[in-house]
Amino acid sequence: MAITTLDFNQFRSTSADERQIFCADLCETLSVYGFAKIRNTTLSNELIDEIFKYTRSFFALPNDIKAKAKHPNAPNPHRGWSAIGQERVWKISGFEQNKERTDSYNEFRESFDQGAADDQLFPNRWVDEDDLPGFQAFMEGFYKSCDELHAHLLRAISTGLKLPDTLLPSKHRHNTSELRLLHYPPIPCSALRSNMRIGEHSDFGTLTLLLQDSVGGLQVEDQRNPRSFIPVEPEDGYEVVINIGDCLQRWTNRRLCSANHRVMLPEGKDVDSEEVLDDRYSVAYFGKPDRDVLVDTLPECVEVGERVEYGDHLTALQYNQIKLTRTYG
């Protein structure tokens, strides 16, 4: 079983029928997997090459230089460089199913988080310009490019769900989304027998856009067969993997569900082997609603007589903080 790949050129077609087919296919794929792959997006191949160049360059910096932009040893502000072991995503595994983990394990990765350049609540943290020339300017521009693609996809999902095409975009007027660079250092296959590169989790926000290199290892839980995982292997490095976040699950009353995912051994690797896995790099844009927007089930997504699953009147910021506090707690 493989995650469906869609062509974004269909959404940009001058044919209304073609655009409608794309929107319907997108929502169908997301309803089955919680994930989809999209090629030919508004993120050009050149732009993707450049973001991976900067990602590798940033993580190659000495730790004392990266620490100039250090993420605090606390949930907020969720900005800057997190060293290996600082964030523990496994602690939110099962959160949406009201399940508490009783086990624990190590996660082998480091990350860098940023928000919008004008975010006054949680300002960004950067290394000095001389440490990595052009990094801040490029990252701020790339963030805007991801924001534009995210807005297109929100319109497509709204259309595919037969909602007003402005409904989901209207909840993202003041960008509070986050852009994350990730580095998974080399590690023996055998070390992942009882550990993970990143633990099983679902994403907090609306929709995640993911770019991954050729190493592999990303897996998504099969929504029709819980506890079975499907590999989301890279194709050519230029497709965008998208996945549903918890807020969209809540708004749609589970018509679209956020799927658990993790990073484990790539396909074809042996957990009993002492072979050392290569560095793995990825880039994730976590689309998130405006902080004061409620993430209750939307009335437009409830059929007559259907039970409303989410009515706890949490704002997007409150929900985000509940999960974030666990990962850095």
Curated annotation (Swiss-Prot):
InterPro entries, sorted: DIOX_N, IPNS-like_FE2OG_OXY, IPNS-like_sf, Iron_ascorbate_oxido_reductase, Oxoglu/Fe-dep_dioxygenase_dom
Cofactor or coenzyme needed: Fe(2+)
Binding, 2-oxoglutarate: R280
Keywords linked to the UniProt accession: Dioxygenase, Iron, Metal-binding, Oxidoreductase
Gene3D superfamilies: B-lactam Antibiotic, Isopenicillin N Synthase, Chain
Entry's Gene Ontology BP terms: small molecule biosynthetic process
Pathway per the UniProt entry: Antifungal biosynthesis
SUPFAM superfamilies: Clavaminate synthase-like
Chain sites annotated for binding Fe cation: H201, D203, H261
UniProt-listed Enzyme Commission number(s): 1.14.-.-
Enzymatic class: oxidoreductase
Use in biotech settings: Due to their effectiveness as antifungal agents, echinocandin derivatives can be used for the treatment of human invasive candidiasis.
Membrane-crossing residue ranges in chain numbering: none
Family listed: Belongs to the iron/ascorbate-dependent oxidoreductase family.
Protein role: 2-oxoglutarate-dependent dioxygenase; part of the gene cluster that mediates the de novo generation of L-homotyrosine from acetyl-CoA and 4-hydroxyphenyl-pyruvate. L-homotyrosine is a building block of echinocandin B, a fungal lipidated cyclic hexapeptide that acts as an antifungal agent. This is followed by isomerization of 2-(4-hydroxy-benzyl)-malate to 3-(4-hydroxybenzyl)-malate by htyD.
Protein name (Swiss-Prot/TrEMBL): 2-oxoglutarate-dependent dioxygenase htyE
Recorded name of the encoding gene: htyE
